[in-house]
Amino acid sequence: MSQEKISEIIKDISALKTSCEKLNSQLDELITQKVENEMLLEEVKVLEDDSVLHKLVGLVLVKEEKSKCYDTISRRLQYITGEIENRKKVITNSEEKLRKLFSDLEAHAGQRKIPVPQA
């Protein structure tokens, strides 16, 4: 295996690690949004049915009925939960690709007696 191939594998590992870091950051943000929306949903649940709520749309407060607000938050939670699951799948796939790249690198470095850099 040539030095170019090893350099290419190292470059792929670096790019994939950067991608994984970005995905983990996005996952953290989605989990935070989910927790915030779950708290909001619990607060809306305890309100009386005829309560009038207000939501901020741009710079304007708009009246909204409790049922509509509850439905909106529930749909948002479903969407966020789906996005969390998607990110977890992508992260898992990326981690598997990383493991494969590391094993390829170790195999090629072992053939050439080159120490594997710790990434």
Curated annotation (Swiss-Prot):
GO molecular function, one term: protein-folding chaperone binding
Coiled-coil boundaries: none
Biotech / industrial applications: Possible candidate for an effective malaria vaccine as determined by epitope response in sera.
Keywords, in A-Z order: Chaperone, Merozoite
CDD domains: Prefoldin_6
Listed GO biological process terms: chaperone-mediated protein complex assembly; protein folding
SUPFAM superfamilies from the UniProt entry: Prefoldin
Gene3D superfamilies reported in the protein's UniProt record: 1.10.287.370
GO CC terms in record: cytoplasm; prefoldin complex
InterPro entries, A to Z: PFD_beta-like, Prefoldin
Family of this protein: Belongs to the prefoldin subunit beta family.
SUBUNIT field: Heterohexamer of two PFD-alpha type and four PFD-beta type subunits. May interact with MSP1.
Function summary: Binds specifically to cytosolic chaperonin (c-CPN) and transfers target proteins to it. Binds to nascent polypeptide chain and promotes folding in an environment in which there are many competing pathways for nonnative proteins.
Protein known as: Probable prefoldin subunit 6
Organism: Plasmodium falciparum (isolate 3D7)
Gene from which the chain derives: PFD6
